[in-house]
């Protein structure tokens, strides 16, 4: 056996254990040099001490610490360096042993392959001899029997070659028994019967071809199992590897501990004993503990060196003392010492670089070895593939023999041709298993054999072939000659279409050697270890690595490139040496100057020493980095060696399985030789035997196939099995069952092989099964443990749809139908109809009541969809007279973040009741979100109330109705159009009554929508016949519809904002020391806010008119007085949308007829701090305010008897953009003042009495529509409620802001009776600090004012005054319709096409009690949320009074004071 792929085999394995010891000797020399270096440094320390002594400036104590520190670091560095070198040397030694073992295994496998190929060639020649035509009279009888016996012997020989050595004894016994059976079966009569039954020679050919293929190029990928392949002629002498220089006794111990294969070998000169790895089987006894035992003496040696260094340090101290005492130091002597030290340092550096070059050479050699092994593996894989193809072809040929043909053609010439074809397939198999350099000879042999086959095609020649006697000796000689003519290396063709890789064996392809060497040294390395060339011969195999990371294009970096990379490092080391030499000369100069001029100072020397230490540290760091690179390369080679070892194990398993298949085929051939009955030796028996041969051939093909091709092989096997079953008739199957032969082993083989993908004899594991064997496990010390990333499962808790079925106290019944509907809803509804919502009225709070969060629901950091739906209450108002607010239905959904195309098509008829907080006690702690606290959420709330019929009759004696609340959290999307028209919107005030002194500030009494995108739409619709009942009842309940719209880019903003009214916000009776608050109605700080209030056409309702006609004024007044005592202010309808933030192209073309009232501050007491923006505080904002009043017909008649009228106000915060047109037409806009009355003492500031929309993009649209005949009631009520349209326009820079601002009036903002020490507050109506705010109030076209005018004419001025005074005492300000839109953060081109006829009423604050803590978001606290709120108020008209005494009278029991 000749190993041609490794550097340690044959002539290329000169480097034995002695050479390894020679390599380790420089390390010993290095250690000695280190000792000398330390000794010389000690003398240098003595020199420094003597110089300091001469100049009388040396302080030994200071230098002592520095010297000790330097010595300690040097010692630690040396110890670490030696330990690292020991580890690297140990790893290199282990890998050497491993490479030797793998190379030995490869050699053995090559030898097995060669022997199997020779056996298959012999069998092929024997079959050809059977085809040779001989004399006809000798074609039968004993000769055929002997030839068959010879074929069996050749098959046995093939099995023997594929068997391990430890099984030879058993095989010999089996062979003796089989030979005896063959000889007993040699009777002429039985041989003649066998000839008459047409013994299938194709089956013999199948046996030969299959067996010759079964031992092909390392057959299996299965792991090696209990098979140890060793040959007597391959036994190798073992020597030892000694890693460190030690005494003779230590070397002897190492020889006893760790035997290593030597370089010499008999017969084939192979140097590998280990079959499955150096750390496996009985030869892997040296584990980690033994390695530690070997390293312990080295540790002891290092400790001894440390003790010696410590002693030398003390000697240095003694020398310094002596030099100080005796003054015997001479500089000339020191000069020689320094030169000697430099010379030794240079020598040390050179030796160190040489050692590094040697290590790099070793790494290069290992790289070459890995390349060679990888090439060998590639060739074996190619052989395996070719053998598999040849066996598959033979299988198909045998199946063709089984195909039923015409009976007259199944004999004679056809059989002869089929046998010839089988011989050709067998020759092809032998050719595939032969090396390339023998292909020419094989081709000549094939040509001759083909000619012989063609010549032997006649029946006469066939008879002659049967009569011929082929000499067995010549066959044996041929087999021996062929076995010797072929080398172990088969082919240098790359692997074709089959890439066997494992994920755990993937290796990084960038293996770079970082050591440096000169060109000459690298050339010497090339001469020492030549790389195998590209040509293949009997002993030299070309290596083209095609299946590994270092093969083909990835292996371009050869030795010259490595040398080029190492040269810069060599130059760098030389430069470092020069720098050290220069520093040493600097030290000499400093010493000379100190001696001659008496100017030596320790401080200067101290800096020099520190600099030297710093450079030394840098050098150590660079050296450690270089060692880390070497360790990384070793790790990569570890992985590569392991992968190759695994593949070798799998190839061994394939070899074992092929041997088993060949043994089965041998048994089948013996069964053919068994004498049977003469009548059963033909026909069905031959057919069954051929089928059995086909199955064995299929099994052999399966064994030679890789695991990843099992699926294809299964399909082929199923088809073959079907053909075989179809080719046998039932009669033949019955005969097969009656036959006594084949033997049990053959039956077992047939059953096993008939399974398409089952394991054979439990030796082939399942295709998807991970198989490990203890014999093949590799030592874990050579494998770097891989870190596995642990992935934790993210648990997403999604709240389910919940429905609150509990009814609170003092709440009325709920419709069961609507409750069922709200519970069953899973998606956002397009229309939320008939929604009722009741207010949250907290009872009296005790003192020091702690704060709570989210009384009803606290949905923090959630995307919540809340839908509260109360169904159509048509006749339930009659029953509401003596009961509190009804309990709403609550349906809560957490909707997914999606992009719906349509959000809410229609939010109609939505009612909402106010949130009233009564009689809160002192020191009440703040709480947040009395109804809902939805912090950091995107929340959509829609409150929809619809079709309350006959509502006006029972509104006198009942509490505020419970509106339906439908709330949705809408997905973030980009709708194209937002709201084309927001019509008929009313808004009512939020009244805060009798809050005690010291009330802490709170935020967002109704809504605190901080840092949110808010859209509030208050829509009041279809107010029919409400003018007559407004005298006798409190403010009606508006409809509430609220939507959270997408963050989108609507194209339309507001084409026309028409007819908008706005009323003031009044704060009454605030006591002294009232702290400042912000945004009494809306606090929209740092937000983009859009508010639009639109009041529109109020149509006539005949039924309501008739009812008013039926009732007299006296009855209405009496009903109003009775109703005001028993009810709370009703909830208006509110429709609110959040609009997107966009850049509108057209904003407002013309701002016409703009009226604005002044802001008046009345009666502010002393020490009252300033406040900002009583009506609007728009600090640091670009604000456009348009107040438009138009077509006030006969308005002067009623101005005498009423409070100052509320003009129409249109206000806009223009976006930061350059729009082409701002507002097309803002017509007839009124605005009323904001009054603050009698705030109690020490009232703490609060923020956003109605809405606190801080840091939000807000759009509020209040739309009041179709108010007809409202002029008649203006005489008996307070200042009328103007129409208010407010928008927050985009952050844009308009080119044209206001084309025409005509007829603009401004009314005052009245702050009444503010007590002393009242702290400043901000934005009584709106506090829009640091925001871009657009507010537009548009009042338009009040139709049919003539009838109202006539009614005023019928009443005298005195009656109107008396009615107004009585009305002011008996009623609360009514709730107008409010339609509010929260605009999205986007760039809309046009926002609202038409906002018509919008009214808004003020927000009143009454009698806050003492020590009242601030709270946030009385009704809703939606912090950091995208919220849309829509309130729609229906059937109401609002009148404002600023009288707190009447409110105390009206709330009787609740406000006793």
Curated annotation (Swiss-Prot):
Basic residues composition bias: residue spans: 1102-1120, 1346-1364
Residue spans of biased composition, Basic and acidic residues class: 190-200, 461-472
UniProt keyword Transferase, yes or no: no
Compositional bias of kind Acidic residues: 165-181, 436-452, 801-810, 821-833
Start and end residues of each Olduvai domain: 165-259, 436-530, 707-799, 800-871, 872-963, 966-1021, 1022-1114, 1115-1207, 1210-1265, 1266-1358, 1359-1457
GO cellular component, one term: cytoplasm
Residue runs in coiled coils: 75-119, 339-390, 610-661
Localization, UniProt: Cytoplasm
Region (Disordered): 162-200, 432-472, 721-746, 791-838, 1100-1139, 1344-1378
Keywords noted in UniProt: Coiled coil, Cytoplasm, Repeat
Predominant cellular place of this UniProt entry's protein: cytoplasm
InterPro entries: NBPF (IPR055306), Olduvai_dom (IPR010630)
Positions of disulphide bridges: none
Tissue specificity statement from the Swiss-Prot or TrEMBL entry: Widely expressed with highest levels in brain, ovary, mammary gland, skin and adipose tissue. Also expressed in testis. Detected in a number of tumors including osteosarcoma, mammary carcinoma and hepatocellular carcinoma.
Extra information: Encoded by one of the numerous copies of NBPF genes clustered in the p36, p12 and q21 region of the chromosome 1.
Family: Belongs to the NBPF family.
Name of the protein: NBPF family member NBPF12
Lineage: Eukaryota, Metazoa, Chordata, Craniata, Vertebrata
């Amino acid at each position: 056996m000749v190993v041609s792929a490794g550097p340690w085999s044959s002539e290329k394995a000169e480097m034995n254990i002695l050479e390894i010891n020679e390599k380790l000797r420089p390390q010993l020399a290095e250690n000695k040099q280190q000792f000398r270096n330390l000794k010389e440094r000690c003398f240098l320390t003595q020199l420094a001490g003597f110089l300091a002594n001469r100049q009388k400036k040396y302080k030994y104590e200071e230098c002592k610490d520095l010297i000790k520190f330097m010595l300690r670091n040097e010692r630690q560095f040396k110890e670490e360096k030696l330990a690292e070198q020991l580890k690297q040397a140990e790893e290199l030694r282990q890998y050497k042993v491993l490479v030797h073992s793998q190379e030995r295994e490869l050699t053995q496998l090559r030898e097995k392959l060669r022997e199997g190929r020779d056996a298959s060639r012999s069998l092929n020649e024997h079959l050809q001899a059977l085809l040779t035509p001989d004399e006809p009279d000798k074609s039968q009888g004993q000769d055929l029997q002997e030839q068959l016996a010879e074929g069996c012997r050749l098959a046995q020989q093939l099995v023997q070659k594929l068997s391990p050595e430890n099984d030879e004894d058993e095989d010999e016994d089996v062979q003796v028994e089989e030979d005896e059976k063959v000889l007993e079966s040699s009777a002429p009569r039985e041989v003649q019967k066998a000839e008459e039954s047409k013994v299938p020679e194709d089956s013999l050919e199948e046996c030969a071809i299959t067996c010759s293929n079964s031992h092909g190029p390392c057959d299996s990928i299965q792991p090696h199992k209990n098979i140890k392949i060793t040959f007597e002629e391959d036994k190798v002498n073992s020597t030892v590897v000694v890693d460190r220089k030690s005494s003779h006794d230590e070397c002897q111990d190492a020889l006893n501990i760790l035997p290593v294969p030597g370089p010499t070998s008999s017969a084939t000169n192979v140097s590998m004993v280990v079959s499955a790895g150096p750390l496996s089987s009985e030869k892997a006894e040296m584990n980690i503990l033994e390695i530690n035992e070997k390293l312990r003496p080295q540790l002891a040696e290092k400790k001894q060196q440390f003790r010696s260094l410590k002693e030398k340090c003390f000697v240095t101290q003694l020398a310094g003392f002596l030099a100080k005492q005796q003054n015997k130091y001479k500089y000339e002597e020191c000069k020689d010492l320094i030169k000697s030290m430099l010379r030794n340092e240079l020598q040390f550096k050179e030796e160190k670089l040489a050692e590094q070059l040697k290590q790099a050479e070793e790494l290069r050699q290992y790289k070459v070895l890995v390349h060679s092994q990888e090439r060998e593996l590639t060739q074996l894989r190619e052989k395996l593939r070719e053998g598999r193809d040849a066996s598959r072809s033979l299988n198909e040929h045998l199946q063709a023999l089984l195909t039923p043909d015409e009976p007259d053609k199944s004999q004679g010439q056809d059989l002869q041709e089929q046998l010839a074809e089988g011989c050709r397939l067998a020759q092809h198999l032998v050719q595939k298993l032969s090396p390339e350099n023998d292909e020419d000879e094989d081709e000549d042999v094939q040509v001759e054999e083909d000619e012989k086959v063609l010549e032997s095609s006649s029946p006469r020649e066939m008879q002659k072939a049967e009569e011929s006697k082929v000499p067995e000796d010549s066959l044996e000689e041929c087999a021996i000659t062929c076995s010797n003519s072929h080398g172990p290396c088969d082919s240098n063709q790359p692997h074709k279409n089959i890439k066997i890789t494992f994920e755990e064996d993937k290796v990084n392809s960038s293996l770079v050697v970082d050591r440096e060497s000169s060109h000459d040294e690298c050339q010497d390395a090339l001469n020492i270890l030549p790389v195998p060339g590209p040509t293949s011969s009997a002993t030299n195999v070309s290596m083209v690595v095609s299946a590994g990371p270092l093969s083909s294009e990835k292996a371009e970096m050869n030795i010259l490139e490595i040398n080029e990379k190492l040269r810069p490092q060599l130059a760098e080391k030389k430069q470092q040496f020069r720098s050290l030499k220069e520093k040493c000369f600097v030290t000499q100069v400093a010493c000379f100057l100190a001696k001659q001029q008496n100017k030596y100072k320790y401080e200067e020397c101290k800096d020099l020493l520190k600099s030297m230490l710093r450079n030394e540290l840098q050098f150590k760091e660079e050296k450690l980095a270089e060692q880390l690179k070497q360790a990384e390369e070793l790790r990569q080679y570890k992985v590569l060696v392991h992968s190759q070892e695994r593949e070798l194990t799998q190839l061994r398993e394939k070899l074992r399985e092929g041997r088993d298949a060949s043994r089965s085929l041998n048994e089948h051939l013996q069964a053919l030789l068994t004498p049977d009955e003469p009548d059963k030796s033909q026909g069905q028996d031959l057919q069954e035997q051929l089928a059995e041969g086909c199955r064995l051939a299929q099994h052999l093909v399966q064994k030679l196939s890789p695991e990843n091709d099992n699926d294809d092989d299964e399909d082929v096997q199923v088809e073959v099995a079907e053909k075989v079953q179809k080719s046998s008739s039932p009669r033949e199957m019955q005969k097969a069952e009656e036959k006594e032969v084949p033997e049990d082993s053959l039956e077992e083989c047939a059953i096993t092989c008939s399974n398409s993908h089952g394991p054979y004899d439990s030796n082939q594991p399942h295709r998807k099964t991970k198989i490990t064997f203890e014999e093949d496990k590799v030592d874990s010390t050579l494998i770097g443990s891989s870190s596995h990333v642990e992935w934790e499962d993210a648990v997403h808790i999604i709240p389910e749809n919940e429905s609150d079925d509990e009814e609170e106290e003092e709440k009325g019944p709920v419709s069961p139908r609507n409750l069922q509907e709200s519970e069953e809803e899973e998606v956002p509804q397009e229309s939320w109809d008939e929604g009722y919502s009741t207010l949250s009225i907290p009872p009296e709070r005790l003192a020091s009541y702690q704060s709570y969060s989210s009384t009803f629901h606290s949905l923090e950091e959630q995307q919540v969809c809340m839908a509260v739906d109360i169904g159509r209450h048509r006749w339930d108002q009659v029953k509401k007279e003596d009961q509190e607010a009804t309990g709403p239905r609550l349906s809560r959904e957490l909707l997914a973040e999606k992009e719906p195309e349509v959000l809410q098509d229609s939010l109609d008829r939505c009612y909402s009741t106010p949130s009233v907080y009564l009689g809160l006690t002192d020191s009440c702690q703040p709480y947040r979100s009395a109804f809902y606290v939805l912090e950091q959420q995107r929340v959509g709330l829609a409150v929809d109330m619809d079709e309350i019929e006959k509502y006006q009759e029972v509104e006198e004696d009942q509490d505020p109705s419970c509106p339906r609340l439908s709330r949705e959290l809408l997905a973030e999307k980009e709708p194209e159009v937002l709201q084309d028209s927001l019509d008929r919107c009313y808004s009512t005030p939020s009244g805060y009554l009798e809050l005690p002194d010291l009330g802490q500030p709170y935020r967002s009494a109704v809504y605190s929508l901080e840092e949110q995108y808010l859209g509030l739409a208050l829509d009041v619709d279809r107010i029919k016949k409400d003018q007559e009942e407004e005298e006798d009842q409190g403010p009606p309940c508006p409809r509430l519809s609220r939507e959270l719209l997408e963050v989108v880019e609507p194209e339309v903003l507001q084409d026309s904002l028409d007819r908008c009214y706005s009323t003031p916000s009044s704060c009454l009776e605030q006591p002294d020391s009232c702290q400042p608050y912000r945004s009494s109605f809306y606090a929209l700080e740092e937000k983009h806010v859009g508010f639009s209030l639109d009041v529109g056409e109020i149509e006539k309702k005949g039924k309501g008119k008739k009812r008013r006609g039926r009732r007299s004024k006296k009855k209405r007044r009496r009903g109003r007085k009775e109703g005001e005592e028993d009810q709370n202010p009703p909830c208006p309808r509110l429709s609110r949308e959040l609009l997107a933030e966009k850049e509108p192209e057209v904003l407002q073309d013309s701002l016409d007829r703009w009226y604005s009232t002044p802001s008046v501050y009345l009666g502010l007491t002393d020490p009252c701090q300033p406040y900002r923006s009583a009506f609007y505080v728009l600090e640091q904002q670009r604000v456009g305010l348009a107040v438009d009043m138009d077509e006030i017909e006969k308005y002067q008649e009623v101005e005498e008897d009423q409070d100052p009228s509320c003009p129409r106000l249109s206000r806009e915060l223009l976006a930061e953009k350059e729009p082409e047109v701002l507002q097309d037409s803002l017509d007839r806009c009124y605005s009323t003042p904001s009054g603050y009355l009698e705030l109690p003492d020490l009232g703490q500031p609060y923020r956003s009495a109605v809405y606190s929309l801080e840091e939000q993009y807000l759009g509020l649209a209040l739309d009041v529509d179709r108010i007809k005949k409202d002029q008649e009631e203006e005489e008996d009520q307070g200042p009328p409620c103007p129409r208010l349209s407010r928008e927050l326009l985009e952050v844009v820079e308009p080119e044209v802001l206001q084309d025409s601002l005509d007829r603009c009036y401004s009314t005052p903002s009245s702050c009444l009776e503010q007590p002393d020490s009242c702290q400043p507050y901000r934005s009584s109506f709106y506090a829009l600090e640091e925001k871009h705010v657009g507010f537009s109030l548009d009042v338009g076209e009040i139709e049919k004012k003539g009838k109202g005018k006539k009614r005023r004419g019928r009443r005298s001025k005195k009656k109107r005054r008396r009615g107004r005074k009585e009305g002011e005492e008996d009623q609360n300000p009514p709730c107008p319709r409010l339609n509010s839109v929260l605009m999205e953060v986007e760039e809309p081109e046009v926002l609202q096409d038409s906002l018509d006829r919008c009214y808004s009423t003020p927000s009143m604050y009454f009698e806050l009690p003492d020590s009242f803590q601030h709270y946030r978001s009385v009704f809703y606290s939606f912090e950091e949320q995208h919220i849309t709120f829509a309130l729609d108020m229906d059937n109401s008209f609002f009148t404002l009074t600023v009288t707190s005494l009447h409110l105390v009278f009206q709330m009787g029991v609740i406000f006793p004071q």
